[in-house]
Amino acid sequence: MPRHSSTMSRLVLPLIFSILLVSKPSPSQAQDESLAGSFLSGLLDTITSTADSKDCPGVCVHTLATLICYEVLDDVACPSPSMKCCIENAPAGKNATAVRATTTPKTTTTASTTTTQRTTTTVATTSTTKRTTTTSTTPKPKPKPQTKRPATSSTTKATVATTKKPSTTKKVATAKPKDKEEATKADDANKDCTGVCVADRIAEYCEAYLTSDGLCKEGTKCCVSLDEYSNGKLPKDIYIPAKHMSNLKPNQTLSEKSAPAKSSSTSTTSTTTTTSTTTTPEPARINNSSPKPTKHKKHPTTTTTEAAEEEEEQETEEDGEEEEPPLSNKLKSGQGQGQVLKECEGECMNGIFAIFCDDIDSDAFCPGEESCCVTGGASEATPSSKAPPTKPAIKHAPKPAAKPARPASPPPAPPSSTSGGGGGGDFLSQIISFAESTLNSPSPPPPPPQAPIQVPRCPGFCLLNIMAAFCERPSVLVSTPTTCAKGSVCCDNSRAGAPKPKLPPPTPSPTASPTAPPYVLPNTPSPDPREECPGSCIVSLLSFTCFKNAEMTDLFRCKRSGQICCAPKSKILEKQQFQTRNDTAYYPAPPPPPIGPPQAYPPQTPPYSYMNNPPPQGPPPQMAPHHPNPYQPPPPAPNYADYYPVSGPGLPPQPQPPMTTPPTTTTTTTTPRPHVYSKYVCGVKGTLRTGRSQALSFVSYARAKYGVQRTARQMTSAAGYSPNFNKSNERLVLGSAIVPIQIHNDKLGDLVESSSLQSNQLRSYHNHQAQADQPDLVYPEYYQQRSLYGLQSNFSGRRRARVVGGEDGENGEWCWQVALINSLNQYLCGAALIGTQWVLTAAHCVTNIVRSGDAIYVRVGDYDLTRKYGSPGAQTLRVATTYIHHNHNSQTLDNDIALLKLHGQAELRDGVCLVCLPARGVSHAAGKRCTVTGYGYMGEAGPIPLRVREAEIPIVSDTECIRKVNAVTEKIFILPASSFCAGGEEGHDACQGDGGGPLVCQDDGFYELAGLVSWGFGCGRQDVPGVYVKTSSFIGWINQIISVNNL
């Protein structure tokens, strides 16, 4: 009882004193010092107080003091509710399940058969057991050194029976118990746990723990400190968690058996408690390389004797020995069999973190699935053969576990030995230990280690298998065995050749073409005269990431092969114009005869013939007007005379050339460079594209490149607009509010039956008035108040007017312009071509015709609808499906947009191209000038030329638009969120017949479809802007329809 109190006081008092030091009162708290002192004094007395209880086998202590108890019995009642029954030491044997405190005899047997009388004591009762130890003289292949807690003494030559008192610890002695210090450790080995018994789940946090049974009760482990073994070798049954492996001293080793082996190979033990042990002959041991026999033991039922315990300990050791070889995280000592693993000289790392290592030592020990990461100048290791380690290896004892299947492996041939008399067993074990240590000791590398030279060294660098994809060209993966560790692969980068020179070559290759694929070769890079990519270089697989104002092009070079430049469109346009200005004049010797496909501008991609039967063409046009050239093109063919009614396609008298001509213009060549833009590039005018016919390219070339301005024509007197007008509620819908206009009767061709009524009654609109073709159900009733008398005019004069004011567009310039016509070959509305199978227009243009079930046709690539044969490349296609926006309001014209899917695909050729769609939600700044095109009226009263014209108008902010429109109407005008305003300049505006047509804004040199003509109050009135559909508000709706149809 006093011992319990002193123990608790020894542990708790330092804690209390530390609390006192921390909570030492300041001078301002002097008045509370006595209170604190009395409180702590009472707390100390309470914690250190103990009490006895008849039911408690130990002593009742305070709950806080149970931390030092070996076991706490919660079901035992104590005098105070705050107390628990505490058992300080391990109970000394409770029936068969109690932990046994055994008596360990020190016995040395001789070659003769002897009978030793032993006194064996158990904890519960002391009984005498007579044990007969039979020692056979059969020689063993290799006597296995054993370390048993009953350590033997080598000084005894006679049969000695010694009874030791029960010890509290079992400590393994060293392998050479000759001096007095070794004998003292052998005595300490008979004690129980020298550390602290902790639960199994906490044992992994110990610096080390012993795995032998009997040290602690079931479910606990003996947790010890490595400092206890700082001057000696580690016992066999010690287990060191991986995180504490670094705490080992270099001179500490873990031996399998530290005591000399007994010379007895077979022992049969008989006890009075019917404990029987049978011996299995040595030849029957197939799966165990240990020379010990496998013992099958029937446990006693009631009492446990010393002999039974000793056998159990021996079998436990055998179990551990059988478990050791399959474990991958074990370090074998020089005295054992199996693979020799060295200690990791770097750091053990797990999983993907191993990729950051300079090298991975596969022969070094790391726990679990971790790898030994060697950084810096660590020596390279060959996985096939390793030299013996320079310091003793460390054996990592395994945890007790079920016996796994052990593969049969023949042990190394030991020297044959026989049992000698007296200390022969000890002498034999010493010889074996010396021989094994000699074999495993460091020595100069003999000639056989020359074998690793056969494994070729990795010519590049080693990568983990999961990182093999990062071995990129021109590096290659080496499939043959190399010096790379297991789980790694060699990436050979020696074949990459010298790095690519950064300096430009002095003499460019004359055969280099700027439009060819990249020229980077593995070893001998060809000179590339192209400029560096001003954008980003990406692989073609990621070309979809190059969008909006950027485009994939071969005009610029990339540093790495297989990549293409994604450059801004403005840079591409500048480069293209620069190349065009550097083209020299094309001087044909005689004017060539009429030719088929155009040859003046060969496309960058494989050439396409856009005109199967082209009309006769004049000589090739003058390519560079800034070069003096007496050659003048002759008058064009009659088919193109109507496009240039004044003076043909000739230029005005020699405009002033720009003075920024590069020096290279002095060279001449007969092969002009092609334009960069192919037919698939959106937002590029038809005058800047490849494959454009020579006759159409002449005027547009000079206008687009050298600033030759067109003559603008203002609204004629027919539009008679006076700014002094009264407010009204009129609203002009710029599409369905016009009468369908008859166009030439060959536009539909074979799309309608020749015997049908509409085909037989087609009439030229030159001799008829609009009223003759006006249906009754075309417009809402409140729109019919406007008199469309402008259609009575005669169009034989071919006045160039369309949108109010503006100017003529060139033939094929606005190549995304589309005309909607009905089955009677009558023009309805404008539209824009956004895909080879998709057309975007205003919803009010098609709602009535869709209700009637009539067919709709589109005309693409036709500059002049009044001509009999149309423009080169023009096509007519039938609309297969009409998608009107689900929220379209025909009264307020909100969401006035429709998507038309064509039956078949439009061929992108001369005069036919696509317009770019804007990004979702993009709005253009107020004041930005954009271009509206269409076939419609020249003024509010007409006439309509049905020829593509353009007008440049400014974007108007929403607030200004609402203010200006409300100033001319009696009704309150509310601008829908999906619409915007543009225009408001007198004489320049869209008008009737332009509905659904495109309003395009230039962004980085490319045109985006900013809006569709919807409606407005009059045409070309000052400060009265028109309303347009905001295309960017419907990008999601458009993409959804197109993606569903493309499935």
From Swiss-Prot:
Q: Where is the signal peptide?
A: 1-30
Record-linked Pfam families: CLIP_SPH_mas, Trypsin
Q: Which residues are glycosylated?
A: N95, N251, N287, N582, N726, N794
| Residue span of region Peptidase S1 | 803-1043
State where composition is biased (Low complexity).
98-139, 148-175, 263-280, 662-672
Task: Map out region (CLIP 5) in residue numbers.
Answer: 532-567
Which residue stretches belong to region CLIP 3? 343-374
Protein's UniProt name: Protein masquerade
Location of this chain's protein in the cell: Secreted; Cell projection, Axon
Tell me which family the UniProt entry assigns to this protein. Belongs to the peptidase S1 family. CLIP subfamily.
One GO cellular-component annotation of the UniProt record comes to: plasma membrane
In this chain, composition skew of type Basic and acidic residues spans 176-189
Q: Which cysteines are joined by disulfide bonds?
A: C56-C85, C60-C78, C69-C86, C193-C222, C197-C216, C206-C223, C344-C372, C348-C366, C357-C373, C458-C490, C462-C484, C471-C491, C533-C565, C537-C558, C546-C566, C682-C916, C829-C845, C930-C1001, C961-C981, C991-C1019
Instruction: Give the matching SUPFAM superfamilies.
Output: Trypsin-like serine proteases
Which UniProt keywords are present, listed alphabetically? Cell projection, Developmental protein, Disulfide bond, Glycoprotein, Repeat, Secreted, Serine protease homolog, Signal
Following inactivation of the gene, the phenotype reported is: Embryonic lethal as a result of neuronal defects in the central nervous system (CNS) and peripheral nervous system (PNS) from stage 15, and defective muscle attachment from stage 16. Defects in the CNS include stalling of the growth cones of pioneer axons of anterior and posterior corner cells (aCC and pCC) leading to abnormalities in the horizontal commissures and discontinuities in the longitudinal connectives respectively.
- Segments of this protein annotated with the region CLIP 2: 192-224
